[in-house]
Amino acid sequence: MIKLVRIDYRLLHGQVVFAWPRALDIDHIIVANANAAGDAFVSMSLSLAKPAGVSLDIITVEQAAEKLTSGKLDHKKVMVVLGNTAETLAFVEKVPGISVINYGGIAQKEGAQQFGKAIYLTEQEIADSQALKAKGIRLEMRQVPAHSAELLNDKL
């Protein structure tokens, strides 16, 4: 069962590794990111960052969708971490029933507009987010579970 879908350009780091799994009793993390899945060094580094007692997959969006829709992880409490809005939109197209997406960190870059404390969106990322919103998905900006969620839907 998917407990959290999160966009975070850093993929696995302190907030993702410690705060969210504890708050949501996560026992399986899927990093669905083509770059990480295709780079052995990045995959190894991310594997070292995973919390004890939590299993980890570093796979593509397509592989994540297949794994999640196959029923193989129905008994698990899963957190899916994606690196960007494009992969998130592709993921949502393949995995039905996603109702909330956590925007945890999208890096500042040239031409990006700030929407939240750690959320900077380019025109394409805004378009991707609007497409997610149009699917009826609640887009919450929140870095850690202890913070209040700020709704991105209202700002798009």
Question: Where are the regions a protein language model picked out?
Answer:
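Long, hydrophobic N-terminal alpha-helical segment
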Residues: 1-55
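General beta-strand structural signal in soluble alpha/beta enzymes
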Residues: 5, 31, 57-60, 80, ...
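Short gly/pro/ser/thr-enriched loop/turn and capping motifs at secondary-structure boundaries
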Residues: 37-39, 64-65, 108-111
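Short amphipathic alpha-helical segments and helix-helix/interface helices
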Residues: 46, 88-92, 129-130
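Short, hinge-like loop/turn segments at secondary-structure boundaries
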Residues: 47-49, 75, 119
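Ordered, amphipathic secondary-structure segments that act as subunit-interaction surfaces
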Residues: 59-104
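Glycine-rich, aromatic-bearing surface loops/beta-hairpins
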Residues: 94-156
